[in-house]
A protein has these predicted regions:
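Minor-groove-contacting beta-hairpin "wing" of winged helix-turn-helix DNA-binding domains
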Residues: 87-100
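Short recognition helix of helix-turn-helix/winged-helix DNA-binding domains
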Residues: 1-57, 68, 72-75, 102-111
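Generic structural motif recognizing short loop/turn segments at the entrances and edges of beta-strands
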Residues: 1, 76-78, 94-96
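Short coil turns linking two alpha-helices in DNA-binding domains
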Residues: 62-67
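Basic side chains
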Residues: 23, 68, 82, 93-94
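A short, conserved structural fragment
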Residues: 75-87
Length: 114
């Protein structure tokens, strides 16, 4: 798999931040534009439903610690919103749901990600 990121965004958010932000933006925008608009849609927002382990599978070259720290930092700085929405049928698995806040969407536009 080939992945790219904005170097300007990486200057501000670090390489891990840029890669994770662009991965989340890609999945959320893909859901928004898909024919099945209801997938990942709740509370009038599109979400990326995954856990840290899911992101680790998507981004195997970034460690668990770096993914967790980057996500927590983006949430604490108000760029991402994170919730545990509902329990799934998979043995009580409760994935996190992520979406961008208004500041996060502004950042995506500012850096021409979307």
């Amino acid at each position: 798999m080939m992945q790219v990121f904005s170097t300007e965004l990486a200057e501000r958010e670090g390489i891990y931040g840029a890669v994770i932000i662009q991965r989340l933006a890609y999945v959320i925008m893909k859901r928004k534009s898909s024919e099945n608009h209801k997938e990942g849609y709740a509370e009038h927002k599109y979400w990326y439903t995954t856990g840290i382990m899911g992101l680790l599978r998507d981004l195997p070259y970034i460690s668990y610690v770096h993914i967790r720290g980057t996500i927590d930092g983006l949430v604490s700085r108000g760029l991402l919103q994170k919730i545990v929405f509902k329990q799934t049928k998979e043995r009580g698995r409760r994935p996190n749901w992520y979406t961008f806040t208004a500041d996060g969407w502004r950042m995506l536009y500012e850096f021409h990600i979307i």
